[in-house]
Structures are given as structure tokens and as C-alpha cells.
């Protein structure tokens, strides 16, 4: 294990380091000192940067010295829009298809999990995947879910667009021919009037979330363990901070209690800045008023801190982003209630973040802000930002800049780019969202994923999109003029997020006195071929000087975590994001493609459109192994 290599100096420095990472290619993110060969850490902060010789005097008898073996070291990543609290509470319940390269494999995982899931529990595939990632390039069918898990309820969420349920899940959810469609959603029915197992966001996603909420929840002990393991999974990719954007079915303070307790006991392995999101239409102003009277932005510490309100302030002002459906028309009069909410926050010193997908929504929101600006309420020193902003226009960006706003962009187009392209065309997709135009105006821009329900939480997939403009299926959406170079993109994932929370002096760069948050990468992000970027992981992640993730040569150096619980959890058996084995991956994809050809033959034979599949394949080959 490479944990030595600098001999202690004969005369110990009066302040020796707790940790030294040597023999590294350190990208600091600091324009004043962009590179180094070693980094020293003490008391959770960066003590010094230099080369191995420079830092030799900081090595004492108790110093842990890690040889990076020439690997790239970067500042810890910061996802500026991640539903980390909700994700943590559900992580061990979910079967993750993130990174799985074939539908055949995904369905095999489903069938295997059905064999261990106890009666009464559901199998949940909770987003983070797209058919474009599969060799077969298609969705699963309800029939395939029924075949894989005939008796165990299965709920498969596909982005914010749709969900598939097997027969057992339809029964468990209580859906019948008499169940009414929820507002903004559709329960698809067959000719007999019975639910088929397909749910559509048309365009609102409430039908998807409310159905998923019918599944059993974890008890508090398992919610705690689940959160610990989700944070460690994020650490696996070099994430050291995140801005939690709240979300539906995430109630304050009840659903925040787990992370509050982990912060109290010093067990968080990720720094979290969190927002508060009114949950019930018609009660938004009452919720916001109560919060402004009981808590304040800044409450907490460097590990867990309240940042403000959002990403929704009022439900009527939210435009949903199912690009398979037309842009939703918001109510003609939503501004009246929305103005009251924003006024309340600004008058009480609260910042906020605001979900806004379409420029049409952004322009209406900006008109409200400009009205309040005339009264001196903007910018007023309160941090505020738009989330998503896929179709924001240049003149709207100018208005955002004038009002002191910022933006958080995500790689939803990595997963939804195909349907966006189909609806709006190549010209619109080429600058969705217009990140280059944002940066050219000097706006603060931060990057994130919007995981776990749409994109995967893997930040390297998001970075790949920023530098290539390609979907996970390889479709090129953005021309070279709209792309970022690798250092620019990394800056959005480090310094950008720190600026949104006012922590740019201590976070997002490797500089003396800053938080000791860093990642030693499996491959050099700055030099590897573009197609390799999504496969990057961290082999050593340090947060506040603590080693919270260690792999490869460093396995065993990380802080201990409790076993995954419950024992039947999909995470206990499959882990989270599917691992890539590099060269072995090509062989696996070839196998998947071969299997998909067999699958197509089987489907054709079943429909009468092709030759019989033969006696060896009386059932779907996806489910026969």
C-alpha cells in the first residue's frame, strides 16, 4: 500500500502535517499557483503546497504519507444541484441502473433482486438512466417487468417523463379502472379501462413521485445507514460538497433529521448546504413565513448549513421539464403569490434558488424581481439563482446579471437531449443551456447533475457533457463554440458551487488555509481521451483532512462505514453506479449487442414478424440467464 515515501526531516517542523499526498500532479484551481507536486494537510485545512522536497519538513512520526503514484489530484467536486438528502434516505432501497450498459443486464439485475426482496417491499429503479445508454437503445416493457418479477412490485422511473410498473406494483399502489388521473399526469389504460402499468408526466411529475411515495419507507436506523452509504458513494467520484435543492416529498424538519444527526456526531463525509421547499400548494406562504421566523440562512457549520429557500417557492410558478411534452403554460396570475413569496424572503435576508426550465418562465419571474428592485429589494446582498435555465435567452441573461443573480446548470441534456432534439430541433439544442453566453457575461455559473431522479449522480458524466456536448448515447448536440475546456468545466464543478454559497475563500481551490477537500483520480481528467471522462472515479477522497473513500492501492485507508442495511438491499449486492473495468468493458458491450440481436429475433418471432427463435429460446433471452 503506497502510504510512505518521504522520510521525516531530522529536525521536525513545529507544526507537522496530519496528511501529506506526494508524487502527485496537483491541479489546484488557484490561478496564482495552478500546479504542485504535493499537498500537506493539518487540522482539516491545506497547510502547504509544493514539491516532495518542499514538504519533507512537514512530515513527522504521526504524519500519514500517501504516494499518489503520479496521479492527478484535483479540488474536491461540488455538485451545485443534487437532491442528496432525499437520495440518502432512499439509496439502499433502490436498484441503480446508472452506468449499466445493456437492458439485458438491467433486467437480469431486476430478476435477481426479486429473488431476495421480502414480501411487502418494492423494487425501485429510481432514475439516473436512459435507454440511450443501453446497447439495445430501448426502454424495457411492462411485459418484461412482469416476467422478471411476477410477484414483487416493481417501479421503474424514467427521468421526469414516465414510469413503468409491473402488475404487482399496480395492485400495491391501489390503481384500478376507477382511479382518476392526477392533475398534470396520466395513468395509461388499456382498451378494457384497466391501468397498463405506464404512468406519464403530462407534463407534471407529481403522478410519478406520489406513486413512488406509496412504497414502504425505511425505519430511522436504516435511513441513517442509507445516508452514510449514499454519501460514501458520492465520495467515490470525488465529491466533497453538494448543494441540496430540496424537492417533492422532502419535509422540513422531519426529513432533514437524519443529516442533522450525522452532522452532530461528525459522521457526514460530504459538506451539505441545503434549501427549504414548500411541499403543499396553497400553504407556501405560510411555510415560508414560519421558516423565516424560526431558522435563518447560515445556521449550522461548515458541514451542514442552511442556504435559503427553493428550488420551488410556489407550486404555480414551477415549469416542469418533460421535453417529450409541450412546454407547460403556467397560470396567467401566478405572479401575485410568487411576488409575495419573494418579497417575504428578501425582506428577511433569505436567499433563494428557483427552478425555471424555460425562458418564458424566467422572463415572467424577472419582471417580478425588477418590480421589487425598484423598491430596493434586489440585489440587496441576498444570494439568489436560477436552476436549469435550458432555454434562457441572451437578453434574459443580461437582466439576471443586472439583478445580481447566478445560475446552476445541470447535464439533463445528457439524458434528455434526444427528446429535446426531436421537439425543438438542432439549433435550439446546440445551446441548451447557453453556458458560454452565461460565462461571457461574467455571471457566476455552477454545475451539477439534478440527481438522483433525472441524471445520474456521477459528476464525470456531467463534466463529459460540458466538454463534449454529447449525450450519454453519443449524440452530438453542441458545436465547438459552445463547449468548455476541461479546466473551465472543472471550475464550474468546484469554484462555481463555492461561490453560490459564499465559500469561495475556503472551498473550490487547493490553497493554504482552504478546506482540505481533494480527490486523487483514477485517470487524468486533463489528458485522457474525451470518451474516457465518464469512467473516471476517485481512488482517494479527502474531506476536511479525513480519508472518506479509498480504492485500488489505497483500499482500507478510509474511515469505516456500517454494513449496508437491510441485508436484502440492492446496494448490498450490486452497489451503486455500475463500475467500468476499462478494457473489459468493450468485451461486455460486444456481448450485450449480441444478446440484443437475439432479443430482437425473439420479439419479432413473438409478434409474427420474423422466424421462430428456435427451441433454445422459448422465453425472452434477456431473462433466460
Language model: regions and residue ranges:
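Flexible loop residues that form catalytic
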Residues: 29, 128, 247, 389-390, ...
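Residue-level recognition of conserved beta-strand edge/terminus positions
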Residues: 126, 157, 410, 519-522, ...
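His/Asp/Glu-enriched, well-ordered alpha-helical/loop segment
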Residues: 343-353, 357-384, 388-389, 394-398, ...
